[in-house]
């Protein structure tokens, strides 16, 4: 971890206060490669993270209900919902288990019951041509599991995937407006069923939108962020607690429909091309002044 960070010293656009801050590990995302919940010592590992006041964001694909039922308290529990129907899920995920759909349904039931104390989040990664249809079936899953929040994100193109059965191109990557349209339709379907959800926050730069249970709307303001010190305080108290016990108010710039669209106004985007033009303009101005002095 530290070796990777050190390589960034001196890179244009790096803020030194952020660079120094990165040497203090604060969050751990248990995701990306493999299935973390299938690791036999996952609870012990999460406990080790918490002892160091490192938050735990665990992502699972809802294929191991027994392991999910035994999972200890984590800061946030993600469940990847990759497709809305059995047919589509088989196409997208190419699951190893023949009873993959039954496993998924069991995990959704566990979220609503045994793991209802957790801060649970559905994660939907939208891929055009694969999983952006059938809003009603997605709503069925939400109604069954009752997650705390639903995070919808447009897929990011990482190069060609030819040869793996699902060749993706830029044509499969949705625009932000397409993601917004999907979320608005899903939200409308949820509300038509009497489910107490609404669109809470967005980060347009990441093509990401958050739908949340309205219980996170406190005194007229969304509280979808996490109060990390409070989480560890509650954890160390030994008392039982739920997702609402460690919430933090959502910044105004992150709220759905805000002018900032999720971009923190305290940050500035580093534009390499703009920086080059700026430096060139400075050099040209200096050369002009030098020429005038010589004349």
Where in this protein do the model-derived segments appear?
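Conserved AdoMet/S-adenosylmethionine-binding subsite of the radical SAM
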Residues: 5-189
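Auxiliary Fe-S-binding modules of radical SAM enzymes
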Residues: 112, 130-295
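Low-complexity, serine/threonine/proline-enriched polar segments
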Residues: 1-3
């Amino acid at each position: 971890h530290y070796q990777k960070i050190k390589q960034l010293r001196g890179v244009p656009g790096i803020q030194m206060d952020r660079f120094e801050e990165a040497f203090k590990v604060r969050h751990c995302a248990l995701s990306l490669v493999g299935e973390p919940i299938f690791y036999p010592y996952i609870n012990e590992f999460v406990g080790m993270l918490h002892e160091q006041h490192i938050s735990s964001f665990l992502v699972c694909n809802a294929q191991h209900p027994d392991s999910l039922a035994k999972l200890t308290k984590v800061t946030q529990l993600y469940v990847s919902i990759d497709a809305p129907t059995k047919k589509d899920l088989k196409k997208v995920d190419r699951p190893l288990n023949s009873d993959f759909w039954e496993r998924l349904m069991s995990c959704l039931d566990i979220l609503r019951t045994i793991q209802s104390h957790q801060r649970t989040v559905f994660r939907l990664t939208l891929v055009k041509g694969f999983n952006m249809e059938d809003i009603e079936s997605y709503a069925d899953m939400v109604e069954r599991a009752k997650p705390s929040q639903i995070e919808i994100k447009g897929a990011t193109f990482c190069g060609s995937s030819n040869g793996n059965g699902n060749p993706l191109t830029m044509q499969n990557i949705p625009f932000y407006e397409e993601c917004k349209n999907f979320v608005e339709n899903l939200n409308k379907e949820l509300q038509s069923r009497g489910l107490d959800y609404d669109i809470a926050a967005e980060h347009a730069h990441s093509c990401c939108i958050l739908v949340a249970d309205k219980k996170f709307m406190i005194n007229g303001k969304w509280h979808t962020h996490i109060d990390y010190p409070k989480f560890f305080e509650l954890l160390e108290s030994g008392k039982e607690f739920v997702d609402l016990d460690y919430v933090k108010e959502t910044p105004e710039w992150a709220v759905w429909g805000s002018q900032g669209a999720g971009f923190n106004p305290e940050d500035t985007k580093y534009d390499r091309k703009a920086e080059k033009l700026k430096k060139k303009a400075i050099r040209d101005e200096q050369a002009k002044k030098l020429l005038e002095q010589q004349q």
